Amino acid sequence: MSGNEAIAAAARDAGFTLGIGYPGTPSTEILEHYAACGGRAAWAPNEKVALEVGLGVAFAAARALVTMKHVGLNVAADVLFTAAYTGVSGALVIVSADDPGMHSSQNEQDNRRYAVAAGVPMFEPAD
């Protein structure tokens, strides 16, 4: 099982209401697998909209999974910081798929800094 498949299965098993994101390698597979294993998934027109929709789901006391590649979090940063200070009634999990070594992206950035700056919990997968 790949990391993307594990994220999708965990969201499904945890009873997430919606998985939403903007397609971009290396994060695209997460929502594809989430939909394939029975989760309700949708693509948004951009990363900001994806996070806004996910935030709305979490405001309604439901669980939302939001996926995007690392540069997409730049687009969604306003919403991320707003969510950090408003809080949510449900659950909001944001998966930012970084691309060390720029295998499929135009830049390399470390999005763990966003979590630190926003003061939100962060999980970092490891072997």
Predicted regions and their residues:
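Thiamine diphosphate
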Residues: 1-122, 126
